[in-house]
Amino acid sequence: AVVDFVRRRAGQCGIVYCMTQADAEACADHLTDKLKDVGTTAHHYHAGMTQLQRRVVQAAWQQGKLDVVCATIAYGMGIDKADVRYVVHASLAKSLEGYYQEAGRAGRDGRPSECLMLYRDQDVGKVQKLLRGFGRKKRRGPKLQRDLDRLDDMARYCGMKDGCRRRQLVGHFGRDPGPSHGNGPCCDLCDARNPALRPPPPAPKPPAVRKRGPPVPQPRRRPAPEVVDLLGDSDDEVPKRARA
């Protein structure tokens, strides 16, 4: 899904936020490999790099020599550019506060921009593990609970089925969301209800032309064996999308 989204915006500047350093590196390699045909380049950016390596990547991105930076959420806040046209969260953000700041990296020049978040329900458990920590770095106490509560708010935001994500996000911080966008694009929920933004129906297919001829003999079929459910109970889900 990230590849298709970035492909449709080839030549534009973007940020992809990833959960871990390994995710950021894998995402950058995948985008560069799959988007060679449109000339899109990507590179990872995280705390595991040396200061010189990060400086080189940031300079290339600032100068337009690099299209996409795949950054960890924890370290990607330091990168900034006015003409970022899109921000993608390849996984669930840790909080609405963090998402608001990260998504705000797009469109700082005042031009239209887009934000996309891909998530699965099981991402909540993964982020909870990161927040709780491991071994000697395992966290406890009220600060951990506060972070877990913020994660719950983020999950509820992603699970919205109606309403407006923009109004929900702005209202979370006690601000007036202002008037609606009318017939213009807003969030995925509003756009789905907006007739002006619905794609036109596909053109009807021409009727099939049947050629007359002698009947084709059909081979005799053996009785079909009993069908066995090879998949079983699968927990896999298609990534859900949230755009605000």
Task: Describe the residue ranges of each PLM region.
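Accessible peptide chain termini
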Residues: 1, 243-244
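C-terminal accessory region of SF2 helicases/translocases
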Residues: 66, 83-84, 92-101, 107-236, ...
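Helicase motor core with emphasis on the C-terminal RecA-like subdomain
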Residues: 1-139, 178-179
